[in-house]
Amino acid sequence: MKTLILSCNTGGGHNTAGRALLEELNRRDLPAEMLDALSFGRKHTSRIVSQSYISVASVTPKLFGGIYHLGDFISSSHRKSPVYLANAHYAETLHRYIVENGFDTVLCPHLFPAEELTWARKKLGGTYKFYMVATDYTCIPFTEETEPDAFFIPHADLIPEYEEKGVPRDKLLVTGIPVSRRFPEHMEKAAARQALNLSRSAHICLMMTGSMGFGDILPLPEKLCAAEADVQVIVLTGSNAEMRKRLAERYGSSGRVIALPFTDRVADYMAACDVMLSKPGGLTSTEAAALNVPLIHTDPIPGCETRNAAFFQEHGMSLRATGTEEIAQTAASLLYNAPLQQAMIQAQAKTINAYAARDAIDLALERCSSPGV
């Protein structure tokens, strides 16, 4: 099996899922490549689309939510959307690349390449198989107008939602959301703290702002530290250099508040913390659950993140809080509530498949060797 993974730079989660799948393929020494699906468009297509997404989602989240819900409203299996038509413009170039390079399997942890390949196979044929890999705990708008060989979805409880949108039941395969093995196969807390040079005795609260540093979190560390004397707050600010600078200016070098840039050691910081605060992105939430971290979801970007937060809360895998005061109070309560932490960890272990990447590749391999499937 030779695999092409197609993602997009509209948020870090899609690429993170893609890299988890690539990691699993590399473990098995299977030929694989990961590309930006929008790179097959015009020269600046990827940059323009990605920057527009980030700008709308971070600067005007209510507008983003309105656009999402409008998409949900007009989404239908009976007609093609403007999203489908826009992606069709560069589908032929992508199709040619797949055929010329001998890929027999394509994995799409993003809607856009699934739209492209739906058009390409209808108009141009092709013997390769492609799969859409969901990265949120909901059926996102326009999923039903794509026609992959199968949909790899996060949980069996989402099957009715997909069916209601018009996705055929026999195409729904429950795998979970792919995350790196670094999360389920993490260091113990004491070892992680030693490796990161963190306090062994402090109650550590990890604040995740997402790959793009969403959220006005400046006052929150102060509230968290005020709750108890032994609380230490670590803020992973993603690519938001301005946020990191403002945190450093406000909290100095006391050591109680540590602001860090983008890091490839997220799993280690999660393993080291006692409680994690995060916006409810599908990937970050799944990584936390795969690592069994007590989790508090903060203000979501309206749309699929709202659904993610609801799914986690309904399954006992997280708490939810909004606003600085409520978030600080909820975090302080959870930090010192061992029974609630344990109940949350047990719910995460019961609900989340930490080895979804492995299972997705197993299914793709099985179907690659069975032409009729």
Where are these regions (language model features)?
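Donor-nucleotide binding loops and adjacent catalytic segments primarily
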Residues: 189-194, 198-273
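C-terminal "capping" alpha-helix adjacent to the active site of nucleotide-linked donor transferases
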Residues: 313-316, 323-339
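Conserved N-terminal ligand/cofactor-binding loop architecture of enzyme catalytic domains
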Residues: 20-100
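Active-site and donor-binding regions of nucleotide-sugar-utilizing enzymes
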Residues: 12, 17, 69-166, 171-174
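C-terminal alpha-helical cap of glycosyltransferases
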Residues: 354-373
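A nucleotide-sugar donor-handling region in carbohydrate enzymes
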Residues: 149-204, 208-211
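A donor-sugar binding/catalytic signature common to diverse glycosyltransferases
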Residues: 268-307
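A short, well-ordered alpha-helix in the C-terminal region of glycosyltransferases
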Residues: 340-354
